[in-house]
Amino acid sequence: MTLESMMACCLSDEVKESKRINAEIEKQLRRDKRDARRELKLLLLGTGESGKSTFIKQMRIIHGAGYSEEDKRGFTKLVYQNIFTAMQAMIRAMETLKILYKYEQNKANALLIREVDVEKVTTFEHRYVSAIKTLWNDPGIQECYDRRREYQLSDSAKYYLTDVDRIATSGYLPTQQDVLRVRVPTTGIIEYPFDLENIIFRMVDVGGQRSERRKWIHCFENVTSIMFLVALSEYDQVLVESDNENRMEESKALFRTIVTYPWFQNSSVILFLNKKDLLEDKILFSHLVDYFPEFDGPQRVAQAAREFILKMFVDLNPDSDKIIYSHFTCATDTENIRFVFAAVKDTILQLNLKEYNLV
């Protein structure tokens, strides 16, 4: 065999090997692209306390590993802290609103609770349990609770305070509902990926308070769906950050910004009108028309109120071709969220069938 033919032979082997490697790389790239496309990014947006973190907890319960005993134990301290935070907020509001305690001993109880550094709370000592129970049963505090729209109080306050005896028992382990109700403001970005039908749903929760929103910007790439939460019960409340601004107006302004962002032109928008249970309670004594004069429906009818609120948000969408998918929700109700998210999942998959090679 001549030198030339040997070189040609070697060269053709090299070419073959090179082609094989190239083909392998191309195949891997196609696989990577396909796999990347099998991940759906869902961005959870909404103002502070609209229920985003609770929604993520529900995804963990419904589609993830849930909460083990050990996980639940990790929430014990937070439940105690939520109770102290709620009672301290009411004690401060008693002064601001000039409401008197009916029982004289509650002045001393209020002083005792006020001086607790909530962030250092890790146990629930008997003297504090007793003081909190006595305070909660005071008609003055009950009047203060009824006027909670005039100050900032967590939605979970009543849930925990009516159950102090159970929470104060030794060996207390938070229930799933206790975990869902714990309020910890979200700072930074929380991602929760879960696998459904061989597709990864990556849910991203960003803090809703104003100071947190500037951190959102880099979450905006490749978003499949925006899931925007509105607290229906906030129509008569003011912002944590600014006590002369209506919370629902703030939520509307944020939604308007989101639906007009060029980033989201190709993202579907799903609107969760959350806290429908709180709206049903509140609408009986706090009239929507007092805060939104354009409401001309019947008073004390939750259905009329929520339909009006839905229309207010849908009307902010400038693109008549873009459908806003909406659901009324109660984020602390696991069965409600299971049902709603099944519908949402079907919507998202239908909208992305071709894009994600799902057909």
From Swiss-Prot:
The keyword rRNA-binding does not apply. One of its GO terms (cellular component) is photoreceptor outer segment. It catalyses: GTP + H2O = GDP + phosphate + H(+). It is found in: Cell membrane; Cytoplasm. Keywords: Cell membrane, Cytoplasm, GTP-binding, Hydrolase, Lipoprotein, Magnesium, Membrane, Metal-binding, Nucleotide-binding, Palmitate, Transducer. Residues 270-277 are annotated as: G4 motif. A lipid is attached at residues 9-10 (S-palmitoyl cysteine). Gene3D superfamilies: GI Alpha 1, domain 2-like, P-loop containing nucleotide triphosphate hydrolases. It is a lipid-anchor. It comes from the Eukaryota. GTP binds at residues 46-53, 180-183, 274-277, 331. It holds the Pfam family G-alpha. One of its GO terms (biological process) is phospholipase C-activating dopamine receptor signaling pathway. Signal peptide: none annotated. GO terms for molecular function: G protein-coupled receptor binding; G-protein beta/gamma-subunit complex binding; GTP binding; GTPase activity; metal ion binding. Its main location: membrane. InterPro entries: Gprotein_alpha_Q, Gprotein_alpha_su, GproteinA_insert, P-loop_NTPase. Mg(2+) binds at residues 53, 186. Guanine nucleotide-binding proteins (G proteins) function as transducers downstream of G protein-coupled receptors (GPCRs) in numerous signaling cascades. The alpha chain contains the guanine nucleotide binding site and alternates between an active, GTP-bound state and an inactive, GDP-bound state. Signaling by an activated GPCR promotes GDP release and GTP binding. The alpha subunit has a low GTPase activity that converts bound GTP to GDP, thereby terminating the signal. Both GDP release and GTP hydrolysis are modulated by numerous regulatory proteins. Belongs to the G-alpha family. G(q) subfamily. This is Guanine nucleotide-binding protein subunit alpha-11. It comes from Sus scrofa (Pig). The gene is GNA11.
